[in-house]
């Protein structure tokens, strides 16, 4: 199997971490997002969405992190995507929630406009309004994650690690670029620490820290 990805991207890191944890052998093909390779015709022919990751398994091609995680979990027979209907539905629910609620506000509304020039709004007023709106909503979703999804649980679906944790942890740790303080949400900080304690975390996320986190150390960002 081949994975088109970028090792620092929020969407690629969940797949790479899951594959590393499960010993899944992938041929990694880096798409240079910083150079705009995803917008070139050659990659557009692979994924018309012009986004990573993309998984190729023989003649089968699959896009979207959540879909790829489910596919790999099925192939590996991983308990991280349980077969029992209600447990699996809960994992699907949490993954949809991360993608449609938390990521929309925390990543696309609050962080990306501050981190990525291509996401910055056209003028300062619109930029400030966008960040302020997203900040209000992101804090709400962080409280839902802290109080309802996590609570006293070890992971977002209960006591067992699932692919929903792999998806969500990449979104939350994007906040490290802007040095976000999650201490108001102690269950979230506990869960982040647990996920980062995985033996594969450092090697999989090395490029993320070198390319995004470390270069932003002196940049000023809006706080939550």
Model segments located where?
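Juxtamembrane membrane-interface segments at transmembrane alpha-helix termini
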Residues: 200-201
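Acidic/histidine-enriched, glycine/proline-rich intrinsically disordered or flexible terminal extensions
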Residues: 208-224
């Amino acid at each position: 199997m081949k994975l088109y990805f970028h090792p620092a991207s929020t969407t690629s890191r969940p797949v790479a971490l899951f594959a590393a944890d499960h010993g899944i052998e992938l041929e990694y093909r880096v798409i240079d997002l910083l150079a705009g390779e995803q917008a070139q015709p050659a990659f557009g022919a692979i994924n018309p969405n012009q986004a990573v990751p993309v998984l190729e398994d023989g003649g089968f091609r699959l896009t979207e992190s959540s879909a790829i995680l489910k596919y790999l979990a099925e192939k590996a027979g991983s308990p991280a995507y349980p077969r029992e209907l209600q447990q699996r539905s809960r994992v699907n629910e949490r993954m949809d929630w991360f993608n449609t609620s938390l990521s929309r506000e925390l990543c696309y509304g609050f962080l990306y406009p501050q981190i990525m020039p291509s996401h910055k709004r056209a003028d300062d007023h619109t930029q400030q309004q966008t960040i302020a709106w997203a900040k209000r909503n992101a804090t709400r979703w962080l409280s839902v994650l802290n109080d309802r999804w996590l609570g006293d649980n070890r992971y977002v679906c209960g006591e067992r690690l699932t692919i929903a944790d792999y998806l969500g942890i990449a979104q939350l740790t994007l906040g490290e670029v802007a040095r976000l303080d999650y201490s108001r949400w102690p269950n979230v900080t506990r869960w982040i620490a647990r996920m980062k304690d995985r033996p594969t975390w450092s090697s999989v996320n090395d490029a993320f820290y070198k390319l995004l986190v470390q270069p932003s150390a002196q940049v000023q960002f809006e706080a939550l």
